[in-house]
Regions:
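A short, hydrophobic C-terminal helix/tail in secreted or cell-surface proteins
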Residues: 161-166
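N-terminal localization/anchoring segments of enzymes in phospholipid and broader phosphate metabolism
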Residues: 1-160
């Protein structure tokens, strides 16, 4: 990703510390600084979920999701119905989740089920039947990227407990 030099110039004109941080992010990590972006904080998971559902419905090109814990139930089933519909509309959908879910939340063959719907699915860090330090290296990410324009990070797991569906 290329850094927009006009953004860099504006940062140098405003505050050198910001420009230096931008330089580091761009040159050392490959993350350019942008202008005219928005961030919204969701103090309650239900608010994030409602917003994300609206944005998923708008997807036109791709939806990429990576989540730590997923369980079939109200929240995940709502998302899955949208993902299946979006695949049928020609949207590329990719989903990755942590293999710990296969322990008691999802069947081990769940990626194959999603692939039958046209969703590209991977299970990371599959459970191994022997003791290993790898099992402690879980993927706790909670990321959703829609069309490269909208993103959601953190906060919500897609389980019945998260939906307070007990």
């Amino acid at each position: 990703m290329d850094q927009d030099e006009k953004v860099t110039e504006a940062l140098w004109a405003s505050k050198s510390a910001n420009a230096q941080l931008s330089y580091y992010l761009s040159h050392q990590l490959g993350f350019p600084t942008y202008r005219n972006t928005e961030v919204e904080y969701f103090p309650v998971g239900e608010d994030k979920f409602a917003s994300m559902i609206k944005e998923l419905e708008k997807a036109e090109k791709f939806i990429f999701m990576e989540y730590f814990i997923v369980e079939e139930g109200i929240m995940w089933d709502t998302i899955l119905e949208i993902l299946k519909r979006k695949v049928n509309e020609g949207v590329e959908v990719r989903f990755m989740y942590d293999g710990m879910c296969a322990f008691d939340l999802l069947p081990y063959s769940y990626p194959k089920k999603l692939q039958k719907f046209g969703i590209k699915c991977k299970m990371s860090n599959k459970i191994r039947p022997f003791v290993s330090t790898i099992q402690n290296n879980r993927d706790h990410r909670k990321i959703c990227v829609i069309d490269g324009q909208t993103g959601y990070v953190g906060c919500l797991l897609y389980t019945s407990d998260a939906a307070d569906d007990r």
